[in-house]
Amino acid sequence: MAWKTEVNEVSDDIIDGLWSDDPPLQLESVTKIRRITSQRDISCVIRSGVVPRLVQLLKNQVFPKLQYEVAWALTNIAVDNPGVVVNNNAVPVLIQLIASPKDYVREQAIWTLSNVAGHSIHYRDFVLNSGVLMPLLRLLYKDTTLRIATWALRNLCRGKPHPAFDQVKPALPALEILLHSHDEDVLKNACMALCHLSEGSEDGIQSVIEAGFVPKLVQILQLPSPVVLVPALLTIGAMTAGNHQQTQCVINSGALPIISNMLTRNHENKIKKCACWVISNITAGTKEQIQSVIDANLIPILVNLAQDTDFYMKKEAVWAISNMALNGSHDQIKYMAEQSCIKQLCDILVYSDERTTILKCLDGLENMLKAGEAEKNSEDVNPYCLLIEDAEGLEKISKLQMNKNDDIYEKAYKILVTNWFEEDDENNNNNVRCDDVDFQV
């Protein structure tokens, strides 16, 4: 039967045992404390005032079993109360235990430190500034603690504002080795650590690129495991959010054909959303990069995904399309129109609460209409106006004049006046919406 605490306070016998000079009695009392914290009765442990004594016992190098039980109790306390661990000066002692000769002590110490660092950027920076990184990195070459050490490294890299890049940059060589692991948990956490390192700045992205990670990350995209694919895509997406040269590095590594293949397979939508996000970052780039997306035959795939019943899947696909509409050449926009991209941009306009997405699509449609001026037929008709009308886009844009958001109204108004209606300066005021709608009162 599992041991359960039936008291709401730490007994005097337990406290007396902690302060005893008898190591077996100390161990017995610490084990009881650990069991109480495992039952989530952590507040009574904190109230009892035993944490300073636990930290003292943590220093007992001749009794690793005692150190292990203390570290376990502190691990549980650190989940919701990292300040208790920090304020009782446990972090420096835990960092020393990373070098313990006992695997189980090392692992439990890392777990506690990771819980502290993962709680907030304040505690993350405190643990980093306490000198945890180099001792931790040495453990990344030991199979016995590899999983938890990689998880701890991920926690040390996460959070916004990001840690100072120079402070975590020494982790790059170890992460390069970790990306060759066959352990899914190790790969997942290594990718997420790289993702966090790449999110902070273009300098961070450049360091990751120069360390040679991109080809390996692209190779990981071919693995079947969803556990690994999402972190790998997030990392590549963070890199494509950098400058054009950094985005080009991802393209040159052969990512697009693999992503194209990924989007046509029976992957869960979470993976496909991440893949579309990567594409949208690329289509926000140069015309040459947009052409790379076209050459990878991704436009028909995006059009298909934009019709998905999952709104967030639809949204990510449309975002990639709208970036292309904004940044593409006339020929590329013409190709998009031929692939029914205009309809997908129009269809998303009914989601009236999606301010950012609607504005993005309106910007894309506006730019396509500008490009359509060069494609006018003999009757001086913009062909993209006709395609928008066929997609019921004119009606949807008109209704957006009633949107409560002024930015959406103004953009819709501008598109309508420029492409469909002539503004009569004598009879219309710029503040009057050009599509009169009768409301039932």
Curated annotation (Swiss-Prot):
<dbReference type="InterPro" id="IPR032413">
    <property type="entry name" value="Arm_3"/>
</dbReference>
<comment type="similarity">
    <text>Belongs to the importin alpha family.</text>
</comment>
<dbReference type="Pfam" id="PF16186">
    <property type="entry name" value="Arm_3"/>
</dbReference>
<keyword id="KW-0813">Transport</keyword>
<dbReference type="GO" id="GO:0048235">
    <property type="term" value="P:pollen sperm cell differentiation"/>
</dbReference>
<dbReference type="GO" id="GO:0006606">
    <property type="term" value="P:protein import into nucleus"/>
</dbReference>
<feature type="repeat" description="ARM 7">
    <location>
        <begin position="287"/>
        <end position="326"/>
    </location>
</feature>
<comment type="function">
    <text>Binds to conventional NLS motifs and mediates nuclear protein import across the nuclear envelope.</text>
</comment>
<keyword id="KW-0677">Repeat</keyword>
<dbReference type="InterPro" id="IPR011989">
    <property type="entry name" value="ARM-like"/>
</dbReference>
<feature type="repeat" description="ARM 3">
    <location>
        <begin position="121"/>
        <end position="158"/>
    </location>
</feature>
<dbReference type="Pfam" id="PF00514">
    <property type="entry name" value="Arm"/>
</dbReference>
<dbReference type="GO" id="GO:0005635">
    <property type="term" value="C:nuclear envelope"/>
</dbReference>
<keyword id="KW-0539">Nucleus</keyword>
<keyword id="KW-0653">Protein transport</keyword>
<dbReference type="GO" id="GO:0005737">
    <property type="term" value="C:cytoplasm"/>
</dbReference>
<dbReference type="InterPro" id="IPR000225">
    <property type="entry name" value="Armadillo"/>
</dbReference>
<dbReference type="InterPro" id="IPR021133">
    <property type="entry name" value="HEAT_type_2"/>
</dbReference>
<feature type="repeat" description="ARM 4">
    <location>
        <begin position="160"/>
        <end position="199"/>
    </location>
</feature>
<feature type="repeat" description="ARM 8">
    <location>
        <begin position="330"/>
        <end position="370"/>
    </location>
</feature>
<dbReference type="InterPro" id="IPR016024">
    <property type="entry name" value="ARM-type_fold"/>
</dbReference>
<dbReference type="GO" id="GO:0061608">
    <property type="term" value="F:nuclear import signal receptor activity"/>
</dbReference>
<feature type="repeat" description="ARM 5">
    <location>
        <begin position="202"/>
        <end position="241"/>
    </location>
</feature>
<dbReference type="InterPro" id="IPR024931">
    <property type="entry name" value="Importin_alpha"/>
</dbReference>
<comment type="subunit">
    <text>Forms a complex with importin subunit beta-1.</text>
</comment>
<protein>
    <recommendedName>
        <fullName>Importin subunit alpha-8</fullName>
    </recommendedName>
</protein>
<feature type="repeat" description="ARM 1">
    <location>
        <begin position="39"/>
        <end position="79"/>
    </location>
</feature>
<feature type="repeat" description="ARM 6">
    <location>
        <begin position="244"/>
        <end position="284"/>
    </location>
</feature>
<feature type="repeat" description="ARM 2">
    <location>
        <begin position="80"/>
        <end position="118"/>
    </location>
</feature>
